[in-house]
Design a protein with these regions (language model features):
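Short N-terminal "domain-start" leader segments
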Residues: 1-41
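A short, charged, amphipathic alpha-helix used as a generic interaction element across diverse proteins
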Residues: 5, 9-13, 43-45, 54-73
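Short non-domain terminal segments
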Residues: 22-23, 51, 72
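Short strand-turn-strand beta-turns centered on an Asx-Gly dipeptide
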Residues: 47-49
Length: 76
């Protein structure tokens, strides 16, 4: 289950980058921290800086919301 969520987040990060110009100006990725597998905490990195630190479920929600906002703004 954890690997599936990690893959989903990575794919969603790539999709977010595509929506923002293929990562030319903006890039986002999931980063494992020391002990991530043991404590369940990861980092979401946006343009080289930590955007969010938390569980995979929290990070997934953040990424999904960011995608939803961009898609909504493009349709306005």
């Amino acid at each position: 289950m954890e690997n599936s969520l990690i893959n989903t987040i990575k794919e969603d990060c790539q999709y977010w980058e595509k929506l923002n110009g293929n990562g030319f100006y903006h890039y986002m990725h999931l980063q494992e921290c020391e002990g991530s597998k043991q404590n369940g905490l990861y980092q979401l990195i946006l343009n080289g800086k930590e955007l969010w630190y938390g569980t995979l479920a929290e990070i997934n929600a953040v990424v999904k919301t960011m995608i939803m906002r961009i898609e909504r703004d493009f349709t306005l």
